[in-house]
Amino acid sequence: MKMDMQRRILTTICQMYYEQNLTQQQIANKTGLTRMKISRSLQKAKDMGIVRIIIDYSGLYLELESEINSKYQLKETIIVDSSMNNDMKNQVASTAAYYLESNLTKNSTIAIGWGSTMSRVSNFIQDMSNMKLLFSPIIGGHGKSELDMHATTISSNLAKKTGCNSLSLLAPALVKSKKEKELLMDDTHIKEVINQTKRADYALFSLGSPLVKDSSLSKSGYLSDDGLKQLKDEGAVCDIVSIAFLNKDGNICCKNITDRSVGISESDLKNIPLKICIVEGEEKHDAVK
């Protein structure tokens, strides 16, 4: 009988709190109990199973995100539900745009990578002119095919959509020789842009699977058959803005190629305080690992 009465009191308090939306103080005033007693009663009701809290995790993967954060020592992971939209590139790009809008700080410089998913971010980003942002390319890419996916073009498009500014790196992403790269890197304008990108507060980039037929790198036309063969021979599975390639063990490979890339270096990218990497597609699994 005592237990039935206790349950009745606890249930009544819960009904007032959860269904009538009364505050703990209002319930205390109404019942003549102290606010502390109301707080303890609500907790006891949870412990007894009178109240069950159900969180709708549909489309969310918080536990998996937490595991990934712990395993790879990441600040934050966002997994986009593939069942939400048939066009996953747009879904990932819109999520990246929202993340930028929510996290960038005023007067920041954002280093920008290249790729097909990256090229769509500007389609979803909102005006941020009050933030006075600067978008700066991580790597060159001017004057080649698939212009819309190059870092300079993406930087420019992001600047236009946000009402902010961008820099242009008017050079190829990859040149034919290390000597040609050194000559370009000695150009005053190119040097200034690269130095500005090195000082970026954020980096927004994607990962590529260099050996996939329709990868951004293969579409760009920068690599010869010999270059593609080198990627295969050295087991490259991950393309980081074409300034670094990794094998399945996570080790740097294909230095002969990255020694010819015109942009910041892999160590420069590491030194940028906050890096935001967006990845989409099953073919990127090995690149992400």
Where are these regions (language model features)?
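Conserved phosphate- and dinucleotide-binding cores of soluble alpha/beta proteins
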Residues: 2-14, 19, 23-27, 40-43, ...
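N-terminal active-site beta-alpha-beta segment that forms phosphate/nucleotide-binding
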Residues: 14, 22, 31, 55-178, ...
